[in-house]
């Protein structure tokens, strides 16, 4: 196995994607002490699971992948798939609407690696730009919903609704386990939270709440505003009645409609949920879009997902950070408020900037135009004798046409328009920002009607009186020049892959190649409604089929669902399949989930959501699962065992040699094996979890398969299963071609518009390229481990002294002897121009480093030199040259402002602070703020835009 030389880089994408060339790899292998990449694989990967290259020159499982294509060939093939789709005018609605994305946002956010390549802002000092953008998003949602606090995005409307339901379940005064849902909530939303409710023992009662609340106790009420039928209902009295009975109320609200109608917070709602899709984010055959969740401050600690708050840095300057992180799954595990990790940051930024670009009056103007088009449609229908069912509506007109629905749907289709067939008697038509007078005329013609001269007689829906989006952020950036410069100014505050490697362990921050990204803006993909007729999307469906087939071959499983729109949802879907499998066999009592103590907290949080009881399995000092303890737990829980969740390679960054034995022991005890695919970047082409004992895995396309992290989303988390679990994969009420399992996302294929990225990556890499990528990632990690071990001991290695694709550096002895902490080192790396590795996971007081295959040897060496220099600084602290309280590590990061201050009373020089390895080392990164005070931010919770005076 070899890395392609630079001589064929014009045609070989693999050499573009993989950072080290063949000479660099030889250098790394010499340091590691192995002769070749294949020799490295033989020493690192257990022989009983390793897929060696066969006589055909290809590893098993990859032999049916197409040969690698060039970038131009791949784009041509994607173009052909795109052209096979029909871009109809979508007037389907049901939560998905066409929108006009300002080009300044597409070019400067969606197509800008400064925005789409960063990771979740766990290092806030070098993430101030996107944290500010997310605070803008939270302010947007809070203002429009009339509620005090909103989180930094959800995965989609359906999962936001499910989280709203479970939040009310935790927070309500009522001890009941029933939730009442209005009949006019979107069907796909009801399906998603029905999935969530069942394993938690929550009963869902669907009722027409216009007729009042049902008898009996319930903890929550869920309504939609406007409803799926388009109806606008004043829920004020109903909400008061629900409160009087000890229940909380959540409203699924259309944010564009809320510029006109009274917001949920002002009619008494406790929670609002929904999507920001129509704020400049294309439909994309279902996603990705930023969902939202807003509530009253008193419930802030119940809020799932990320929450951006305002704090201060060490100089007292206002600064942004993630707030209340103790709610989250990586800390609270099975007691967390949610299993959500990745959300939809990139799309939240798009929505926030769309609102900034248009402002309150612009958004209101768009809403008025949309409503005017809907009224014109209703007027024409009424004039032609067609019954318009609801008089009060925003954008969707429901027409009663007994016996004519299919005819009308077909007539609209002939005119290039898709409408929504509700049932045998009703058709609904939704207007949006892209709707024109010509579209209205064409739809009316499908009903055998014409535009009416008289206006529609329905009521005025513009009942909102409160102001919104009054902060200067939503008034200053109305010209393209000002918006372009604002976005650039924010991006310059952050470290993304366009500036530096991001060596975050367990995150796989690899290249997101431009050729992979190019097609996600093509309208043949972006303007597809997820419920569009099958005949409109043959190209997308072929792409999905290809990708499912390729992932099956790569993983060794029998089927894949692409519906989960994050790794957390893939985990949930996989565990749900196991849960339903046991139930189908008459063993519903099997509810014990074994999880190693080293596992990521999302595993435990996902298991809890499926109603499983988490039992922790111990690990040895070397990080491996304690087989003796596993056998004890298997024996203790044999009759109730459901599943073992295990990450492979392990969360400790090594290939456990007993993995096949572990899987066999679980199967012998009647359980299933869930192999967490978070670390699949060390397996592709080397070992297949579906062949070495896994029954289920979720994959992270935003890690292993090049979908960008977007600063904290989007992601795609497909779930792969063996044949006995196929029928339990996620289904969907509007996609009968899918299995009949329970949906976990609003759209049948989740965030489908991202799938061309992974399709392109696999198509361009081919079998040999994919295997070489895995081997290079392993080589890079082992090279770092060898170079840094004498400075920062590598905590875990496998049987032959090898790590997998990441290594853990142990700083605990340093902290104990010198007092310098892992936080000090992480913050100091910013002064050297690097993003820190993963801090204190899976072991407190450590750094986990994952270089990926995309980083060059020069970049890896620069990182190592920075770490070695930091070790030298630590030595000076240990020698007493600098005190523990005042040294360049404890003072890090250093801003330009602090270095230019007239007073400098530190024992180290300004030059040592700013340029520790000299000005020629690498381009300087200037953190915009000093170290941020996290405790202050949580004690003084502020989660919306600060007044300008705060920064003066």
UniProtKB/Swiss-Prot annotation:
GO molecular function terms listed in the Swiss-Prot or TrEMBL record: glycine binding; glycine dehydrogenase (decarboxylating) activity; pyridoxal phosphate binding
UniProt KW keywords: Oxidoreductase, Pyridoxal phosphate
Reaction equations catalysed: N(6)-[(R)-lipoyl]-L-lysyl-[glycine-cleavage complex H protein] + glycine + H(+) = N(6)-[(R)-S(8)-aminomethyldihydrolipoyl]-L-lysyl-[glycine-cleavage complex H protein] + CO2
GO cellular component term of the entry, any: cytosol
GO biological processes: glycine decarboxylation via glycine cleavage system
Essential cofactor(s): pyridoxal 5'-phosphate
Entry keyword Oxidoreductase: yes
Keyword Oxidoreductase in annotation: yes
Signal peptide limits: none
Pfam family, any one: GDC-P
Quaternary data: The glycine cleavage system is composed of four proteins: P, T, L and H.
Record's protein name: Glycine dehydrogenase (decarboxylating)
């Amino acid at each position: 196995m070899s890395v392609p030389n630079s001589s064929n880089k014009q045609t070989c994408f693999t050499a573009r994607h993989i950072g080290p060339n063949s000479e660099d790899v030889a250098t790394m292998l010499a340091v590691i002490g192995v002769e070749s990449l294949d020799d490295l694989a033989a020493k690192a990967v257990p022989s009983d699971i390793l897929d060696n290259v066969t006589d055909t020159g290809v590893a098993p499982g990859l032999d049916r992948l197409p040969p690698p294509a060039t970038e131009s060939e791949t784009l041509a093939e994607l173009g052909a798939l795109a052209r096979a789709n029909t871009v109809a005018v979508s007037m389907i609605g049901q939560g998905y609407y066409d929108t006009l994305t300002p080009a300044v946002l597409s070019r400067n956010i969606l197509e800008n690696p400064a925005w789409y390549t960063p990771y979740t802002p766990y290092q806030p000092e070098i993430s101030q730009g996107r944290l500010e953008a997310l605070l803008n998003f939270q302010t947007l949602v809070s203002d429009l919903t009339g509620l005090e606090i909103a989180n930094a995005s959800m995965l989609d409307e359906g999962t936001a609704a499910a989280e709203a339901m479970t939040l009310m379940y935790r927070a309500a005064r009522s001890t009941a386990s029933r939730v009442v849902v209005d009949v006019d909530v979107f069907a796909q939303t009801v399906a998603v939270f029905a999935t969530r409710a069942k394993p938690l023992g929550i009963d869902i009662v669907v009722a027409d709440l216009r007729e009042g609340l049902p008898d009996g106790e319930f903890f929550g009420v869920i309504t939609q505003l406007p409803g799926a039928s388009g109806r606008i209902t004043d829920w004020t009295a109903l909400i008061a009645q629900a409160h009087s009975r000890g229940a909380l109320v959540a409203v699924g609200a259309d944010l564009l409609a809320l510029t006109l109608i009274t917001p949920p917070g002002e009619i008494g709602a406790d929670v609002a949920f929904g999507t920001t899709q129509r704020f400049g984010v294309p439909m994309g055959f279902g996603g990705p879009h930023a969902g939202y969740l807003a509530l009253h401050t008193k419930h802030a600690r119940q809020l799932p997902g990320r929450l951006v708050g305002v704090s201060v840095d060490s100089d007292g300057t206002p600064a942004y950070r993630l707030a209340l992180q103790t709610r989250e799954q990586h800390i609270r595990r099975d007691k967390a408020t949610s299993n959500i990790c990745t959300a939809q940051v990139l799309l939240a930024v798009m929505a926030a900037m769309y609102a900034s670009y248009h402002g309150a009056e612009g958004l209101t103007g768009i809403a008025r135009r949309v409503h005017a088009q809907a009224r014109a449609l209703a007027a024409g229908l009424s004039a032609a004798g067609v019954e318009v069912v609801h008089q009060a509506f925003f954008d969707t007109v429901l027409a009663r046409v007994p016996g004519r629905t299919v005819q009308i749907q077909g007539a609209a289709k002939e005119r290039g328009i898709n409408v929504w067939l509700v049932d045998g008697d009703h058709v609904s038509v939704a207007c949006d920002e892209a709707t024109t007078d010509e579209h209205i005329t064409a739809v009316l013609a499908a009903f055998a009607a014409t535009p009416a001269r008289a206006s529609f007689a329905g009521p005025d829906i513009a009942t909102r009186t409160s102001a919104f989006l009054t902060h200067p952020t939503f008034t200053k950036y109305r010209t393209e020049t000002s918006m372009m410069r604002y976005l650039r100014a924010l991006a310059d505050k952050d470290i993304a892959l366009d500036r530096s490697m991001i060596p975050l362990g367990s995150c796989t921050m690899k290249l997101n190649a431009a050729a992979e990204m190019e097609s996600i803006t093509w309208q043949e993909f972006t303007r597809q409604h997820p419920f569009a007729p099958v005949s409109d999307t043959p190209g997308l469906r072929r792409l999905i089929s290809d990708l499912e087939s390729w992932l099956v071959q790569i993983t060794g499983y029998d089927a894949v669902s692409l519906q989960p729109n994050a790794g957390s949802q893939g985990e949930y879907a996989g565990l749900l399949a196991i849960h339903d499998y046991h139930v189908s066999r008459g063993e519903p009592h099997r509810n014990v989930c074994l999880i190693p103590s080293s596992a990521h907290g999302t595993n435990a949080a996902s298991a809890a959501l499926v109603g499983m009881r988490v039992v922790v399995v111990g690990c040895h000092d070397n990080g491996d699962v304690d087989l003796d303890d596993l056998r004890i737990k298997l024996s203790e829980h044999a009759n109730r065992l459901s599943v073992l969740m295990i990450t492979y390679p392990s969360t400790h960054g090594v290939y456990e040699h007993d993995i096949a034995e572990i899987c066999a022991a679980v199967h012998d005890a009647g359980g299933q094996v869930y192999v967490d695919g978070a670390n699949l970047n060390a397996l592709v082409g080397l070992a297949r979890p579906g062949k070495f004992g896994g029954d289920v895995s979720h994959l992270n396309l935003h890690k292993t398969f090049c979908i960008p992290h977007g600063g904290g989303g989007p992601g795609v988390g497909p779930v792969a299963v063996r044949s006995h679990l196929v029928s339990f994969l996620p289904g969907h009420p509007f996609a009968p071609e899918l299995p009949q399992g329970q949906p976990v996302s609003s759209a049948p294929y989740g965030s489908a518009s991202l799938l061309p990225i992974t399709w392109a990556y696999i198509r361009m890499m081919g079998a040999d390229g994919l295997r070489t990528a895995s081997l290079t990632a392993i080589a890079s990690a082992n090279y770092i481990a060898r170079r840094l071990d004498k400075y920062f001991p590598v905590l875990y290695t496998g049987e032959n002294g090898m790590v997998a694709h990441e290594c853990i550096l142990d700083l605990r002895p340093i902290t104990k002897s010198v007092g310098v902490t892992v936080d000090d080192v992480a913050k100091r790396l910013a002064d050297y121009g690097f993003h820190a590795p993963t801090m204190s996971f899976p072991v407190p007081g450590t750094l986990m480093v994952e270089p990926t295959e995309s980083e060059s040897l020069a970049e890896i060496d620069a990182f190592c030199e920075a770490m070695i220099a930091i070790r030298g600084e630590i030595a000076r602290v240990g020698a007493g040259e600098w005190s523990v309280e005042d040294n360049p590590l404890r003072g890090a990061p250093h801003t330009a402002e602090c270095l230019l201050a007239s007073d400098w009373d530190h024992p180290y020089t300004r030059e040592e602070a700013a340029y520790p390895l000299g000005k020629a080392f690498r381009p300087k990164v200037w953190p915009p703020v000093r170290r941020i005070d996290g405790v202050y931010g949580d004690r003084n919770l502020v989660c919306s835009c600060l007044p300008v005076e705060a920064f003066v």
